[in-house]
Amino acid sequence: MKLTGLFKRGAACLCTAAILMSGISAFALSPALPDEPAPAELSVTNAVSEAQLRSALSQLTVTYDSEAEGWQIDSPYEDASMQKSSCGVYPYLFITNDDPTVYISLGMSYFGNKKLDMKSVRVETEDNYYDFTCDDQFTGGYDNDLKSWFDYELFDMDDSTSWLNEWLAAKSVTATFTGKDGSTKTYTLTKDNLQAIRDILNAYDTLLGSDVSTARVVLRSLVK
């Protein structure tokens, strides 16, 4: 196996407790900072029809963040996963009002019967592994309703989607959460988790083939 990527935690506007108590719609991504590598942008030509874009986004949840002034696109599979106290590895898309850039980020959630303050996460296939270095700040806690400990980290992907496609092609994908105390928990990505990644990547590619005006019309109509 070879080391194919080392990622640091990205900035995000999040409250993990709010996510757990109110669903994923309570979560909002922050756009990447200006000095970061520029993510992909919406097309200047209308190569994708409104119907095609609407179809690609219909499997996902679209919410508008008035503070960040943009649309967040995520999978309902993540909310269902959290309600079952299941670990997960889920991507998100974010598009601002005044910028054609499509930002993609990856959220990783730990659930378990013991507190685990995440230090790192290793995602592994039969051929490669990807190490993610977590922030020093503990954003988790104990959820009384779910009766489970949780922690959450969000990573900027800087337009790197090739390894997500590798995960989809792999026979099995595991994520090993390692705590600052050395404790670990290994999670095998479920069929629903992989489908969420597939749906987000499909929406991402379709958005990149859409013009700005069409994308905004469709996003506004799908806001929940």
Annotated model-derived regions:
Residues M1-K2, A47:
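Helix-centric, low-specificity signal for extended rod-like, repetitive segments
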Residues L3-L14:
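Bacterial N-terminal signal peptides that target proteins for export
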Residues C13, F27-K224:
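A generic "folded-domain core" signal
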Residues C15-S22:
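Hydrophobic core
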